[in-house]
Amino acid sequence: MDVVRTAIGLMSGTSMDGIDVALIRTDGRGFIERGPFLGMPYDAEFRGRLKRALELARPLRDRNERPGELREIEQELTLRHATAVTAFLERFGLAANGVDVLGFHGQTVLHRPDEGLTIQIGDGRELARRTGLSVVYDMRANDMVHGGQGAPLVPAYHAALAGKFQQAGEAVCFVNIGGISNLTYIGADGRIAAFDSGPGNTLIDQWVEMQTGRTYDPGGEIGGRGKVVPALAQRYLDSPFFRGNVRRSLDRGDFAPLRPDEASLEDGARTLAHVAAASIVKSAGFLPERPSAYIVCGGGRLNGTLMAEFSAMAEGSRVLSAEAAGFDGDAMEAEAWAYLAVRSLDGLPLTFPGTTGVAAPVSGGVLATP
C-alpha cells in the first residue's frame, strides 16, 4: 500500500509577489487531499531585492555560485520562508510534527535551458534547520542533467487532478498564468504534453509599475479602459518562440518590456493582456488536440481583461477559472510543490518527455533533514 504523507509546498514565482504556502495529504500518485492555503506577500523593499538578484545572477555560469550580495538575498529569502512556515502552522493550528516534508521551490533568478543552466536561490539545508522539518528542494536540476528543459514541473500534479475529466472522456488543458504562462494538456487517454506558452503577468506588471508605481493591474481594470495597439502586439507575437515545433521553457527576461513612451497607460495594459491571451492560444496550437476545457490558475485568472480576451480566442473550448472547476487557483502551484516533494521521497518521476523534453521520466530533488 502506498504511504500517504502530509506535505507543505512553498512557492515564490516569477511574479515575485510573495510566498504561497499550501498543505496536502498525498501518496504522490492519485490520492490527494487538499488542505489550507496561505499567501504571504513580499514588501516593496524585498521585491526590489529580488529584482536585484536577477541582475546579480545574469553573469553566473555555475549554478552553485552565490557571490556576495546574492548570498545575502538568498539568506533573507530562506528566513522569510521559514517564517512563512511558522506563520502557516500557527494560523491553522497545526503541529510541526504532523508534517512529513516541505517542498521548497526557492526563487528562480536565472533559467537558460539552452545552456543547461537553472538557478533557484534558497538554502534548503538552512530551511530544514530553522523549521525542524525535512525539506526537498532543487527539483529542476536533475531534469536538466538528463537533457530536459527544467520546466515545467507542475504538470505531474495537474495530471493527478485531471481524473474527473478523463473519466468523462475529455481532454483538458491547465493554463497557469503567472509571470510566465504555461500549459498542461492531459488527454482522455492520460497522455501529457506541457510547455511554457509565453508571457503571462510579467509584461503587464512591469508596465503598470513603470507607469504608476503599482505592482499589477488589479482585476484588469486599467487594461479594460484601453485598446489594443496592433503594431505593439504583433511585435511580441512575431517572436521566434512561437515558430517551429520544438517547445522550450522561458525566462522572464525573454520578452522585453514596453518602453515608457510607446503607449498610454491603459492602451499598454490592454495590449499586453491581449498578448498574454494570444500567446496561450498560439502555443495551444502545438497541443495534440484542442482541449474541451481550459482550466486557468495563477494570478492572471483574476485579470478580467486578460480572461475576456482569452475566452474570445478559445475557439469553442470552455475557459474556466480554477475555482469554477473545483480547485484553488491561488494554491495550485504551492500544492504542486508539496506533491512533487512526496514523489521525490518515493523516487517517482517529476518530469517526462512530454513535459520538459527529457529523454526518459526522471525523479529529482535534494533531501535536507534537520
From Swiss-Prot:
ATP binds at residues 13-20. It catalyses: 1,6-anhydro-N-acetyl-beta-muramate + ATP + H2O = N-acetyl-D-muramate 6-phosphate + ADP + H(+). The keyword Nucleotide-binding applies. GO terms for biological process: 1,6-anhydro-N-acetyl-beta-muramic acid catabolic process; amino sugar metabolic process; peptidoglycan turnover. Pfam families: AnmK. InterPro entries: Anhydro_N_Ac-Mur_kinase, ATPase_NBD. It comes from the Bacteria. GO terms for molecular function: ATP binding; kinase activity; phosphotransferase activity, alcohol group as acceptor. Pathway: Amino-sugar metabolism; 1,6-anhydro-N-acetylmuramate degradation; Cell wall biogenesis; peptidoglycan recycling. Keywords: ATP-binding, Carbohydrate metabolism, Kinase, Nucleotide-binding, Transferase. Its EC number is 2.7.1.170. PANTHER family: ANHYDRO-N-ACETYLMURAMIC ACID KINASE. HAMAP family: AnhMurNAc_kinase. Catalyzes the specific phosphorylation of 1,6-anhydro-N-acetylmuramic acid (anhMurNAc) with the simultaneous cleavage of the 1,6-anhydro ring, generating MurNAc-6-P. Is required for the utilization of anhMurNAc either imported from the medium or derived from its own cell wall murein, and thus plays a role in cell wall recycling. Belongs to the anhydro-N-acetylmuramic acid kinase family. This is Anhydro-N-acetylmuramic acid kinase. The lineage of its organism: Bacteria, Pseudomonadati, Pseudomonadota, Alphaproteobacteria, Hyphomicrobiales.
